[in-house]
Each structure stands twice: as C-alpha cells, then as structure tokens.
C-alpha cells in the first residue's frame, strides 16, 4: 500500500485520468473530491461491496 500525505487543497493523480483532491479535514473525517472519466466507477467501499454482493446474488440465480 502506498501511503501519501496531502494537505487541504492538494491533489494526487491516479494514472493520467483520475485525480483525488483533499477538500477538507474536520476531526477524524476527510472530505475528498474525485475527478474521473465517466467510464470509471467511483464508489465508497461499502457501496462497492454491496454492488458486488448483488452481482453475485444475480449470478447465483442464473
């Protein structure tokens, strides 16, 4: 795992097309902004896991 330190307003790049910007820090919460092409899905981990679980359930029914 790559670990980076960024300050509010600073950005990191993932590949050529995805940027992640630290928008704010309040207590133990960090607000981030993600710019990515429309064909790149961006989800919070818990939402991604739910989507994957629903896909698995669909495949099990087939």
From Swiss-Prot:
Its main location: cytoplasm. InterPro entries: CsrA, CsrA_sf. Gene3D superfamilies: Translational regulator CsrA (2.60.40.4380). It is found in: Cytoplasm. GO terms for biological process: mRNA catabolic process; negative regulation of translational initiation; positive regulation of translational initiation; regulation of carbohydrate metabolic process. Keywords: Activator, Cytoplasm, Repressor, RNA-binding, Translation regulation. GO terms for molecular function: mRNA 5'-UTR binding. It holds the Pfam family CsrA. Disulfide bonds: none annotated. A key translational regulator that binds mRNA to regulate translation initiation and/or mRNA stability. Mediates global changes in gene expression, shifting from rapid growth to stress survival by linking envelope stress, the stringent response and the catabolite repression systems. Usually binds in the 5'-UTR; binding at or near the Shine-Dalgarno sequence prevents ribosome-binding, repressing translation, binding elsewhere in the 5'-UTR can activate translation and/or stabilize the mRNA. Its function is antagonized by small RNA(s). Homodimer; the beta-strands of each monomer intercalate to form a hydrophobic core, while the alpha-helices form wings that extend away from the core. Belongs to the CsrA/RsmA family. This is Translational regulator CsrA. It comes from Idiomarina loihiensis (strain ATCC BAA-735 / DSM 15497 / L2-TR).
């Amino acid at each position: 795992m790559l670990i980076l330190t960024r300050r509010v307003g600073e950005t990191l790049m993932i590949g050529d097309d995805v940027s992640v910007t630290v928008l704010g820090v309040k207590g133990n919460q960090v607000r981030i902004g993600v710019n990515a092409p429309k064909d790149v899905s961006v989800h919070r981990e818990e939402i991604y896991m739910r989507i994957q679980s629903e896909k698995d359930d669909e495949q099990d029914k087939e």
